[in-house]
C-alpha cells in the first residue's frame, strides 16, 4: 500500500525551525537545537512527521512525547517545529464523527488509505473541507455592527438534533465589514470579516483552540438541575447535577462501561462526548455498533442517538502518550458545545489508563515517583481536568447557559478503592457511584453499592424536587434508612435466624428485599427497564414506602390487643399486593405512557390501603 500520496503537514517549512533527534526512548524523544521552542508546542518528529508535544525544555534540548509509534526514528532525524500548541478544530462536522486522541478523523483516514491501520505521520484535517454546510447569518447582524468574543453570528443545522451555533473565537472583536449571505459554504470559506484598530481579520466556520487551555466563560453558576440517567438507583439515591463531576470506580466486570453507555444513550443531555482512552478495543467497537442503531424520540420524531454524539477513541495501536491527549481533546470539544448553550455530558472511560500513561512518561523522564509509582502531580492533573466541568453563563450574546458534566470511570486494580488514582479522584469529585464486585457476582445490576456510594448534590437539588416532585425527598430518606437498617439486622439474622426477630424488623427485612430486588436492580437489556423516567421511579418508591409504613402501623397498633397482626398474617393476606408491588417495574414507559403508569400506581396505592383496612377490621 503506497501512503506517499497522503497529504503532509503544511504549517511551516522554513529550515530555521528544525531541530534534530538526540535520543529515543519509547514514546519519549529528546531533540537538540530547539532553542526558542515553547512548552506544549506541537512538533513533527522524523522523516515520517510523527505528531509530538514538547513536555520539558532544558537549554536548547527539548523532551518530546510522541503520539505515534516511534520505531524507525533515528538520531539526527529532523524535528519540525510548528510554532503552535496541540489544538483541535471546532466547527460543523463534529457530531456523529469518530476521532482518535489527537482529533484525526478515523473514517476519513480509512477511506483515504483503504487500510484498517493508521499510517504513521498521516495528516488529515479533522473537519472535512469538502462538505458544504447551509449557513444562516444572525438576523440582527449587518455590516457596521460591533461584535465581540463568544457572540453567535450564524447558525448551521448540523443535523436534525443539533443546531450548530457559529461563534466568534473568544479573543476576537471588531466591527463587521462583511458577513456571508445565507447559502452553502464549506469550512474553509470566509463567512465573516472584522475590522479592529485598522486591522482586518477573516473568519471561517472553524475555530482552532489549544486543548490544554480552558475556554473562557462569563461566570460559573451553581448547578441546580439533575442529570437524569434513567437508572433508578442513581436518580433516586445518588443524583448528579448537570455540570457535576462523578466517578464510577469498579473492578473488572462490574458494569462500568454499561453504566457510562446507558448515560450516553438515555441521559437528559443535549450533547454526548464519549472518550474511550486506553480501554479494550471491543468496548469502542460495541459503542460504534450500538449507537447508530439506537434511537430516541424528539418531538414525536425518531432520531439516531449518533446525531448528538461524538466519539474520541484511543485506538489500541497508539502509544500511551496519546491517552492524555484524548482526555484533553474530549473536554475541549465538550466546552465548545457548552459555549453554544448546550448541556454536555462527557464520559471518560477510563481515567486509570490515563494515569498509567502519566506514570509511564514520568518514569521515562526519571522523575521522583510517589505512591505506587505514580507521579507526585497526579492529583493536580486529575483536578485540573475535573475542574473544567460546571454550569456556566456563556461568553457573548445572546445570553445563554450551558454545562459540562464529567463522568469518569476508574478501574482500580483488583477493585481496591485505596488505589492512588481512586483516592485522588474521590477527593475531587462530588458524586461517587461505587460498584461492588459481590453485587455483580450475584448478577445484581447496576451493581452500585448503596452503602458506600454518596452524592454531595442532594441539597442543591432540593429546590428542584420541591417544585416538581414534592413527596420525593422524605421517600428517599426513608428508603436509605430501611436499607441501612437491613444491613445492621443482617448480622443478627446470621446468628439467631429470622424467626426470633421482632415483627417490625421482619417487615424491614422484607421491604428492604423488595427495594433491592425490584427497585434498585434494573435490566438494561429489556425494553421496559433499560430506561426509567423519574415519574416512574418516584411512583414505584412511593408505593413501596407506603406499604412499609402501613405494615408497621398495623403491627404496632395491634401489638397489645388480642387479635395481633404479625408479618406472617400480612404476607398470607397480601400475596396479591406483594406480587403487584414487585412487578411495578414491568410497566413500559414507551408503550403505556406516563398517564397510564401514574394511574396504575395510584390504583395500586389505593389497593394497598384498602387491604390494610380490611385486615385491621
UniProtKB/Swiss-Prot annotation:
Catalytic subunit of the V1 complex of vacuolar(H+)-ATPase (V-ATPase), a multisubunit enzyme composed of a peripheral complex (V1) that hydrolyzes ATP and a membrane integral complex (V0) that translocates protons. V-ATPase is responsible for acidifying and maintaining the pH of intracellular compartments and in some cell types, is targeted to the plasma membrane, where it is responsible for acidifying the extracellular environment. It catalyses: ATP + H2O + 4 H(+)(in) = ADP + phosphate + 5 H(+)(out). Phosphorylation at Ser-384 by AMPK down-regulates its enzyme activity. SUPFAM superfamilies: C-terminal domain of alpha and beta subunits of F1 ATP synthase, N-terminal domain of alpha and beta subunits of F1 ATP synthase, P-loop containing nucleoside triphosphate hydrolases. ATP hydrolysis occurs at the interface between the nucleotide-binding domains of subunits A and B. ATP hydrolysis triggers a conformational change in the subunits D and F, which induces a shift of subunit d. The c-ring is subsequently rotated and results in a continuous proton translocation across the membrane. The lineage of its organism: Eukaryota, Metazoa, Chordata, Craniata, Vertebrata. Keywords: ATP-binding, Cytoplasm, Cytoplasmic vesicle, Hydrogen ion transport, Ion transport, Lysosome, Membrane, Nucleotide-binding, Phosphoprotein, Translocase, Transport. This is V-type proton ATPase catalytic subunit A. HAMAP family: ATP_synth_A_arch. The modification Phosphothreonine is found at residue 136. The modification Phosphoserine is found at residue 384. It comes from the Eukaryota. GO terms for molecular function: ATP binding; ATP hydrolysis activity; proton-transporting ATPase activity, rotational mechanism. CDD domains: ATP-synt_V_A-type_alpha_C, ATP-synt_V_A-type_alpha_N, V_A-ATPase_A.
Amino acid at each position: 500500500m503506497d501512503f506517499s500520496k497522503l497529504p503532509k503537514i503544511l504549517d511551516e517549512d522554513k529550515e530555521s525551525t528544525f531541530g534534530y533527534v538526540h535520543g529515543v526512548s519509547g514514546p519519549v524523544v529528546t531533540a537538540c537545537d530547539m532553542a526558542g521552542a515553547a512548552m506544549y508546542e506541537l512538533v513533527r518528529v522524523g522523516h515520517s512527521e510523527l505528531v509530538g508535544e514538547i513536555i520539558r525544555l532544558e537549554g536548547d534540548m527539548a523532551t518530546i512525547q510522541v503520539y505515534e509509534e516511534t520505531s524507525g526514528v533515528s538520531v539526527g532525524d529532523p524535528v519540525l517545529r510548528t510554532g503552535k500548541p496541540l489544538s483541535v478544530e471546532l466547527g460543523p462536522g463534529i457530531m456523529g464523527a469518530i476521532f482518535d486522541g489527537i482529533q484525526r478523523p478515523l473514517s476519513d483516514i480509512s477511506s483515504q488509505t483503504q487500510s484498517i491501520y493508521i499510517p504513521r505521520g498521516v495528516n488529515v484535517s479533522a473537519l472535512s473541507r469538502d462538505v458544504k454546510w447551509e449557513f444562516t447569518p444572525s438576523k440582527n447582524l449587518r455590516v457596521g455592527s460591533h461584535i465581540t468574543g463568544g457572540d453567535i453570528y450564524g447558525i448551521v443545522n448540523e443535523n436534525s438534533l443539533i443546531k450548530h451555533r457559529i461563534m466568534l473565537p473568544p479573543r476576537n472583536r471588531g466591527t463587521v465589514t462583511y458577513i456571508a449571505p445565507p447559502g452553502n459554504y464549506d469550512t474553509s470559506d470566509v463567512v465573516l470579516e472584522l475590522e479592529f484598530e485598522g486591522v482586518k481579520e477573516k473568519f471561517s466556520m472553524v475555530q482552532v483552540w489549544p486543548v490544554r487551555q480552558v475556554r473562557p466563560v462569563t461566570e460559573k453558576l451553581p448547578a441546580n438541575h439533575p442529570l437524569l440517567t434513567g437508572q433508578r438507583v442513581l436518580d433516586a439515591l445518588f443524583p448528579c447535577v448537570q455540570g457535576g463531576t462523578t466517578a464510577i470506580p469498579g473492578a473488572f466486570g462490574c458494569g462500568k462501561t454499561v453504566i457510562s453507555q446507558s448515560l450516553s444513550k438515555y441521559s437528559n443531555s443535549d450533547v454526548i462526548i464519549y472518550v474511550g482512552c486506553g480501554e479494550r478495543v471491543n468496548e469502542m467497537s460495541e459503542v460504534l455498533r450500538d449507537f447508530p442503531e439506537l434511537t430516541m424520540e424528539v418531538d414525536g420524531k425518531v432520531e439516531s442517538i449518533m446525531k448528538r454524539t461524538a466519539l474520541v477513541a484511543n485506538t489500541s495501536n497508539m502509544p500511551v502518550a496519546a491517552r492524555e491527549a484524548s482526555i484533553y481533546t474530549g473536554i475541549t470539544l465538550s466546552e465548545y458545545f457548552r459555549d453554544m448553550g448546550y448541556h454536555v455530558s462527557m464520559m471518560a472511560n477510563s481515567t486509570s489508563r490515563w494515569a498509567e500513561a502519566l506514570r509511564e512518561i514520568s518514569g521515562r523522564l526519571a522523575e521522583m515517583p510517589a505512591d505506587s509509582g505514580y507521579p507526585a502531580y497526579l492529583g493536580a492533573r486529575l483536578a485540573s481536568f475535573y475542574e473544567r466541568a460546571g454550569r456556566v453563563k456563556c461568553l457573548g450574546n445572546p445570553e445563554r447557559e450551558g454545562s459540562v458534566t464529567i463522568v469518569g470511570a476508574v478501574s482500580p486494580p483488583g477493585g481496591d478503592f485505596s488505589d492512588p488514582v481512586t483516592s485522588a479522584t474521590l477527593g475531587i469529585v462530588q458524586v461517587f457511584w461505587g460498584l461492588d464486585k459481590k453485587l455483580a457476582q450475584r448478577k445484581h445490576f447496576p451493581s452500585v453499592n448503596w452503602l458506600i456510594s454518596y452524592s454531595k448534590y442532594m441539597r442543591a437539588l432540593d429546590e428542584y424536587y420541591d417544585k416538581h416532585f414534592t413527596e420525593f425527598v422524605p421517600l428517599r430518606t426513608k428508603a436509605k434508612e430501611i436499607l441501612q437498617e437491613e444491613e445492621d439486622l443482617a448480622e443478627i439474622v446470621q446468628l439467631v435466624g429470622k424467626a426470633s426477630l421482632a415483627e417490625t424488623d421482619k417487615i424491614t427485612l422484607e421491604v428492604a428485599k423488595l427495594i433491592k430486588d425490584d427497585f434498585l436492580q434494573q435490566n438494561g437489556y429489556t425494553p421496559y427497564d433499560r430506561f426509567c423516567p423519574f415519574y416512574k421511579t418516584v411512583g414505584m418508591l412511593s408505593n413501596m414506602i407506603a406499604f412499609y409504613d402501613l405494615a408497621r402501623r398495623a403491627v404496632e397498633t395491634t401489638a397489645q390487643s388480642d387479635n395481633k397482626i404479625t408479618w406472617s398474617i400480612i404476607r398470607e393476606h397480601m400475596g396479591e399486593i406483594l406480587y403487584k408491588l414487585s412487578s411495578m417495574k414491568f410497566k413500559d414507559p414507551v408503550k403505556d405512557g406516563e398517564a397510564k403508569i401514574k394511574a396504575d400506581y395510584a390504583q395500586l396505592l389505593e389497593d394497598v390501603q384498602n387491604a390494610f383496612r380490611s385486615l385491621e377490621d
